[in-house]
């Protein structure tokens, strides 16, 4: 999983945000995947936070989604 993090001021802040993003991405991925009979997008390739503060996950297929705090995707 490639995690993109911008705007942190300290190494500690970077590490905390990276750990949070990676854990949250795994949770969102598992939930999203559970709603498909056949998941065709592969594993997580890249994770980042967009300009509006939403977590974005790109999968091995190249497809990606935004996720809000409730776990909804679009």
Cite the ranges covered by each PLM segment.
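Short intrinsically disordered terminal tails
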Residues: 1-3, 69-74
